[in-house]
UniProtKB/Swiss-Prot annotation:
GO biological process, one term: L-cysteine catabolic process to pyruvate
Entry superkingdom: Archaea
Single GO term (MF): L-cysteine desulfhydrase activity
Protein's name according to its UniProt entry: UPF0597 protein UNCMA_16400
HAMAP family in the cross-refs: UPF0597
Lineage of origin: Archaea, Methanobacteriati, Methanobacteriota, Stenosarchaea group, Methanomicrobia
Family the UniProt entry places it in: Belongs to the UPF0597 family.
Native source organism of the sequence: Methanocella arvoryzae (strain DSM 22066 / NBRC 105507 / MRE50)
Length: 425
C-alpha cells in the first residue's frame, strides 16, 4: 500500500464540496446564461439553451428558488436578468422579485428556448443570448460550474468575465480505498472542520423544511421518531432529516445546501446520514469529522467512475454507500467490515434508476440512507453480500468499476427511455 499525501485528498474534498441554492441542474443553466449575458454586456432579448439529456431530465420538473415556478425556462430567464452577488451554484441565493418578474416576461413572451441534444458529455449546457445584431455564448461541460468556453459574436474569449474559474483536482482513481481512508486518519480536526460546517448547513435546510416547508414525507417520518430503539434511532432520524432537506430543496425553497460532486442530494445524504449516526452514538467530534470525510470521499470516488450524472440514482448508490462506510467507522468496525457494508449497499441498490429531480427523490434518498445505516450495523454481525455475488466483485474498487460500466454502456438505453417517459407527462 502506497502512502498518499493527505493534501491531495483534502483538495479533492474542498473542490467537490460546495454551497448551492436549489437543484444544481437549473442552477447551472442559470449560471451559463449569466456568463453569456455578462459577455454580451446588455440585457438579452432572446435566450437559447441546449443541454444534454441528463440535464434536461433533472431540470424539467424541479422547483427554482425564489420563483414559485419549475423547470429550465425560468432558470434561463433568471440568468439573463439576475443581479445576484453570489457566485457559482449559489447564484439563486437571494433572487429579487423584480428579477423574477422580468424573467417571467421573457418566458411568457417566447424569448426563452430550451432544447436537449445528444452530447459527448452527460453534463453539458450551451447558453446563447442575443440582442440586436450581437450574440454571446457560454458552455458548461463535465462539471456544474466548469465554464469551458465563452464567446462574443462568434469569437471565443479566454475566460468568462466576472465568473470564478474552477480548478480541477487530482483524480482519486489512482488510489485504493484503503489508502484514501489511511490518509483521512492522518488529518487533523482543524483540517476537517469545514465538513462539520457543511453538515450544519444541510441540517438547517432540513429544519426549515420541517418547520415551514412543503415536506410531507419528512414531517411524517419525523413525527414517528418517538419510541424508536437505540439501534434504529439513527436510521429513523437520518431518514426524516434527509427527506425534509430533499423536499425543501426540490420544491424550490430558498435554503442553501452543501453539495458533493455537484449534487445537493448527495450532500444531504452524506452529511445528514453521518450526523444522525454520530449524534445517536454521542461520537466524539474528531470521530464525526473523519466519518464525514470517509462518507464524502466514497461519494466522490464512486462519481469518478460513474460520472457526475448517471442513469442510476446517484443519491441511493454513491452517497448511501458513503454513509454505510462512515457508519461502520463510527461503530468502531474494521476496514474489512466497512467494505462489507459498502458492497451490500451497492449489491442492493445499484439498479435504482434516476427519473429526474423532483420532490419524490426524497423517498429514494431517505430510504437508501436508512438502509445504508442498517447495513453498517449488519456488517458488524457478519451479515453482508459476499464477494462474487452479482455486481459485487472481489474488491470494492472493482465493484466501483462495475457501477461505472452499469451506468455506461449498461443503462444508456434505459436512460433514453426514461427521458421519453418524463417528457411525455
Amino acid at each position: 500500500m502506497k502512502t498518499m499525501d493527505k493534501r491531495i485528498l483534502l483538495r479533492a474534498l474542498e473542490s467537490e464540496i460546495e454551497r448551492t441554492t436549489g437543484c444544481t441542474d437549473p442552477g447551472a443553466v442559470c449560471l451559463a446564461v449569466r456568463a453569456a449575458a455578462i459577455e454580451l454586456g446588455v440585457d438579452p432579448e432572446k435566450i437559447v439553451v441546449t443541454v444534454s439529456p441528463n440535464i434536461y431530465k433533472n431540470g424539467i420538473n424541479v422547483g427554482v428558488p425564489g420563483t414559485g415556478m419549475r423547470g429550465l425556462h425560468i432558470a434561463a430567464g433568471l440568468g439573463a436578468v439576475i443581479k445576484s452577488t453570489s457566485s457559482g451554484l449559489a447564484l439563486l441565493d437571494a433572487v429579487d422579485p423584480a428579477d423574477v418578474e422580468r424573467a417571467v416576461q421573457l418566458v411568457n413572451n417566447g424569448r426563452v428556448t430550451i432544447t436537449h441534444a445528444e452530447t459527448t458529455s452527460a453534463l453539458y449546457i450551451k447558453a446563447e443570448v442575443f440582442s440586436g445584431a450581437h450574440y454571446a455564448h457560454a458552455v458548461i461541460r463535465d462539471d456544474y460550474t466548469s465554464i469551458v468556453e465563452v464567446g462574443l459574436d462568434g469569437k471565443k474569449v479566454s475566460s468568462p468575465r466576472g465568473m470564478p474559474v474552477k480548478t480541477k483536482h487530482e483524480s482519486l482513481k489512482g488510489y485504493t480505498l484503503e489508502e484514501l481512508f489511511t490518509s483521512i486518519d492522518t488529518m487533523t480536526v482543524e483540517e476537517l472542520t469545514f465538513l462539520r460546517d457543511a453538515a450544519e448547513v444541510n441540517r438547517k435546510a432540513a429544519e426549515a423544511g420541517l418547520e415551514s416547508g412543503p415536506c410531507p414525507l419528512g414531517k411524517a417520518l419525523y413525527s414517528g421518531l418517538a419510541g424508536a430503539g437505540v439501534r434504529h434511532m439513527a436510521a429513523a432520524r437520518a431518514q426524516a432529516l434527509t427527506a425534509a432537506a430533499c423536499e425543501a430543496r426540490m420544491s424550490g425553497m430558498q435554503v442553501p445546501i452543501i453539495a458533493i460532486a455537484g449534487s445537493g442530494n448527495h450532500g444531504i445524504a452524506s452529511f445528514l446520514g453521518i450526523l444522525a449516526v454520530a449524534e445517536t452514538l454521542a461520537s466524539p467530534e474528531e470521530k464525526l469529522l473523519k466519518a464525514l470525510a470517509i462518507s464524502s470521499t466514497v461519494t466522490v470516488a464512486i462519481k469518478e467512475h460513474s460520472t457526475k450524472l448517471s442513469a442510476f440514482c446517484g443519491c441511493a448508490v454513491a452517497a448511501s454507500t458513503g454513509v454505510a462506510a462512515g457508519t461502520v467507522y463510527l461503530l468502531g468496525g474494521s476496514y474489512e467490515e466497512i467494505t462489507h457494508a459498502m458492497q451490500s449497499v451497492i449489491g442492493t441498490l445499484a439498479g435504482m434508476v434516476c427519473d429526474g429531480a423532483k420532490e419524490s427523490c426524497a423517498f429514494k434518498l431517505s430510504s437508501s440512507v436508512a438502509l445504508a445505516i442498517q447495513f453498517g450495523h449488519l456488517s458488524l454481525e457478519d451479515a453482508y453480500i459476499k464477494e462474487g455475488m452479482g455486481i459485487v466483485s472481489q474488491s470494492i474498487e472493482k465493484t466501483f468499476e462495475n457501477l461505472g460500466r452499469l451506468n455506461n454502456p449498461g443503462m444508456v438505453t434505459a436512460d433514453k427511455l426514461m427521458l421519453q417517459m418524463i417528457s411525455g407527462h
